[in-house]
Amino acid sequence: MGVTELGKLIPDNLRRRVSLEQLNGKLIALDAYNALYQFLASIRQPDGTPLMDSQGRVTSHLSGLLYRTINLLEYGIKPVYVFDGKPPELKLIEIEKRRRVREKAVEDWIKAVEEGKKSEARKYAQRALFITSDMVDEAKRLLDSMGVPWVQAPSEGEAQAAYMASKGIVWAAGSQDYDSFLFGAPRLVRNLTISGRRKLPGRDEYVEVTPELIELNDVLKALRLRDRGQLIDLAILLGTDYNPEGIPGIGPQRALRLIQEYGSLDKLMNTVLKNAQFPVDPFKIREFFLNPPVTQEVNVKFKEPNEDEVVRLLVEEHDFSQDRVKNALERLRKSMGKAKGSTTLDSFFG
């Protein structure tokens, strides 16, 4: 997911490097599916096979969710995971395309494993990622037992996270994708990892990263755009999840100049782009970004962990090491009190 071309237009000086310590006490809405995909991609065996329990059920997502969440809490960061709901019809073509890519990757992965090509097998395995409904249910169950809030979006999770940030329910949206700005998030935190490095998509390589904070108003000012509507029109020219190809032949700089000069996609389509082909109605895309389905009433309150339930899910049902889970629970217990200016659980549960 994401509008990567748009990111190329955001100046480096707007990407404020922040430490995890500086995010102490901040409530941040995290893209749950983005996080789960990250765990499935990175927590794997040498041949690309994910971690599994004795019954062959994937557990990489649970391991990643447990330890990443605890790491964030230890820095006093309050994560609220937002799960995708029903995808919009605008996205169905792209979803089908991704499904075919995954199916081909599965075939290539199996072949590479059979031929003993571990590096290739791992590469294809990462492309073959998919999240099942069982994985999502288990992730929600783990968060519930840890006392960490999550929100079910009616449609796009990033739209829900952006809404929560725009209303002050959370301090920022946390995602790798710039879609958050198109949906109206005033503040975006990227690279919210603990290890200090991030895996390159489809490659067995890592790059050093630090969290970065970007503000929507700064982006609009730097790009000399009037409002979010113009930013959305710019993104549509470059390509979004709903029209991934954008307009052929129009790169980031030209797209920006066109929006600055003509002011809107409407005027462009009546002039220089009157012969352009749009597989998906661009005005429907714009309307979806401006008014996506969201849940207005959400509960982001933290609760006391149910340690017995964590043990039941991870140790008894999925064969996690009891000692490791016990150690993780001790860290969870201590980290729940780490909020700015307080060492009590009230700082999280209030």
Curated annotation (Swiss-Prot):
Supply the EC number(s).
3.1.-.-
| Binding, Mg(2+) 2 | 177, 179, 241
| Source organism superkingdom | Archaea
Q: Disulfide bonds, which pairs?
A: none
Q: What are the recorded Gene Ontology BP terms?
A: DNA repair; DNA replication, removal of RNA primer
Chain residue ranges for the region called N-domain: 1-102
Q: Which keywords are on file for this protein? A: DNA damage, DNA repair, DNA replication, Endonuclease, Exonuclease, Hydrolase, Magnesium, Metal-binding, Nuclease
State where Mg(2+) 1 binds: 31, 84, 156, 158
Cofactor: binding details: Binds 2 magnesium ions per subunit. They probably participate in the reaction catalyzed by the enzyme. May bind an additional third magnesium ion after substrate binding.
Signal peptide start-end: none
Record InterPro entries:
5-3_exonuclease_C_sf (IPR036279), Flap_endonuc (IPR023426), Flap_endonuc_arc (IPR019973), HhH2 (IPR008918), PIN-like_dom_sf (IPR029060), XPG-I_dom (IPR006086), XPG/Rad2 (IPR006084), XPG_CS (IPR019974)
Q: Which PROSITE patterns match?
A: XPG_1
Its required cofactor(s), as named, are:
Mg(2+)
Molecular function terms in GO for this entry?
A: 5'-3' exonuclease activity; 5'-flap endonuclease activity; DNA binding; magnesium ion binding
Note down the stretches annotated as region I-domain. Answer: 120-263
Q: What class of enzyme is it?
A: hydrolase
Q: How does it assemble?
A: Interacts with PCNA. PCNA stimulates the nuclease activity without altering cleavage specificity.
> PANTHER family in the record, alphabetically?
FLAP ENDONUCLEASE 1, FLAP ENDONUCLEASE FAMILY MEMBER
Family stated for the protein in its record: Belongs to the XPG/RAD2 endonuclease family. FEN1 subfamily.
Function, as annotated, reads:
Structure-specific nuclease with 5'-flap endonuclease and 5'-3' exonuclease activities involved in DNA replication and repair. During DNA replication, cleaves the 5'-overhanging flap structure that is generated by displacement synthesis when DNA polymerase encounters the 5'-end of a downstream Okazaki fragment. Binds the unpaired 3'-DNA end and kinks the DNA to facilitate 5' cleavage specificity. Cleaves one nucleotide into the double-stranded DNA from the junction in flap DNA, leaving a nick for ligation. Also involved in the base excision repair (BER) pathway.
Task: Tell me what this protein is called.
Answer: Flap endonuclease 1
Task: Tell me the gene name.
Answer: fen
